[in-house]
Amino acid sequence: TRKALADLIHHPNAGGVLVLGLGCENSNIPVLMDYIGEYDKNRVKFLQCQDVEDEQAAAMELLKELADYAGTFKREPIDASELIIGMKCGGSDGLSGITANPTVGAFSDLLISKGGTTILTEVPEMFGAETLLMNRCANEELFNKTVDLINNFKNYFTSHNQTIYENPSPGNKKGGISTLEDKSLGCTQKSGSALVKGVLEYTEPVHTKGLNLLSAPGNDLVAATALALSGAHIVLFTTGRGTPFASPVPTVKISSNSKLAGHKDNWIDFNAGRLVEDMPMEMQIGRASCRERV
């Protein structure tokens, strides 16, 4: 937990950070400082609530300082190679593996072709389709790490008397997913066709560009937070059933079907359901059409 908090404090998306502590908890601010290490005192402020008379007023003063500091920033264009994008699905349906997840996979391939980085997680959702990822590992070391990634989660389940293949959920089944393998084949679609260039432990930061696999469970909040901890600037979240969930970084909701996109337009940012209607994949992931190129 302390390592995770420190990772979020250092996350590049945060222009300013106010770290709040009570004062007598186990993970108090002095303890947390050992995990934070070096930091910019203009960007990170600390407030221990028991030390001040009015913590809300004190917090507002510190937030004003942080806002003034962030106000000195200027937007600048960056190369696509600097981007780190997390990929996650939740509330999947029968179209997730046909529309939304392949769309994210095509985007992942496009970003990687420009030198960028993507991260795929939710390891239990890979069970049954893991060999597709193993066969794309760039070398033997990564292959062995991927095998361990899968087996470690399976061993965790069995050691705690949990059923490995309890997926899919009732919502998945109602949406048209019949088996875990069906769901897993959809999950792995988000990885596109690129080689696996990195396998990360939980909270481990990305250090290799390209496609990375991250050790984290299938739970939406935990997995998306894990993506942020590893450095993801944005999470692309596909769904067929719908969810209002968000994470510590901007979370782009991608629907697998047009019905959901129309019914929950306040939840959904992009409708991938058009892929089975009238929109080619090339346009779906942002490539210019013939008319646009002219």
Predicted feature residues:
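Metallocofactor- and cofactor-centric catalytic cores in central/energy metabolism, strongly enriched
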Residues: T1-I234, R241-R293
